[in-house]
Amino acid sequence: MISPIFRSLRPKLWVKNLFLFVPLLFSEKKFICSWENWLYLLAGFAIFCGLSGAVYILNDIIDLASDRIHPVKCNRPIASGLLSVKEAKAALLLILFISLIAAWNISAMFFSLALGYFILNLAYCLKLKKIAIIDVLCFGIGYVLRTLAGIGALKIINIELQISNSLIISIFFFAVFLALIKRRQDILITENKAVLRRKEYTFYSIDYLDQTTSIIAGLTIFFYAIFVLNIEKTSSFANTNLIYTIPIIIYIILRYLLIIHNDEENELSSDLTFKDKPLIASGILWVISIIAINSAL
């Protein structure tokens, strides 16, 4: 049963946990060039992959009835019957226990953020995802917790990293942007099958989601630009060359919008991300650019 359990952890979505590395990307050269720092963050990344995987299993157990009649989600291991609820619960408890024990051994801050992340998602699965607007805000908070956990992961070796409030806000809005896209695509997938929609989706319309997505996209770019333009005031190092990464962020946002408005198959945003080569390439280019610029100091 290893394969169904692994699939239930949704490894494709673990890419979200890469936000743990953001604080290190925007730190000083001496921190970026230390392999030890990257290894500790890799450990933190693995822990959050376990936590997020446990959350996905929990969500699939709770949504079992609706997933079974959903045109896409019916293929998930639990909904399709490949993984029994009993086995899923056992895997959930084991993975959660191991992840939290590992988090405790990194630092108090990291453990607190990891526990907070799980509690937030537990509340989301049980209640908050049924409340329109609150559901997408939870998504944004989850990304912020991941980012802050990157700072907590390095406290084990007494490294104190700081991160700009503007960057945190930009990350929050980017996550909300992705959540709105997901809502939009899910509505389109089930547009002729209203019975399949979650209750909160009835409060959303395509026009509303298109408008709010555009607004949030603009706010994401705005706060990232504010962060870059004020980098010398918000961190212990100055590098005005980071301004050249703004076009990459603009491209990523506009590419997402282009894809969803030309997606005839109405795929979920997570699937779109991994299928669009320009989007993947631009994300990699952004990371390489940040490392290259900051390492040149």
Language-model features: where?
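Topogenic membrane-insertion module of multi-pass membrane proteins
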Residues: M1-R68, G81-A91
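C-terminal membrane-associated helical module and adjoining short loops/tails
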Residues: I2-F6, L13, L126, V144, ...
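Long, highly hydrophobic alpha-helical transmembrane signal-anchor segments
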Residues: K16, L20-W38, L128-N165
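Generic alpha-helical transmembrane segments of integral inner-membrane proteins
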Residues: L18-V22, L42-G53, A90-I101, L115, ...
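Signature of alpha-helical transmembrane segments in polytopic membrane proteins
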Residues: F21-F31, N37-V55, I95-W104, K155, ...
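Short, aromatic-rich membrane-interface segments at the entry and exit
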Residues: E36-N37, A108-A114, A132-I134, I163-L167, ...
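Acidic (Asp/Glu-rich) catalytic motifs at the cytosolic membrane interface
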Residues: L51-A79, I134, L178-L188, L254-R255
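Multi-pass membrane catalytic core of lipid/isoprenoid biosynthesis enzymes
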Residues: L64, I69-A114, L161, N165-V176, ...
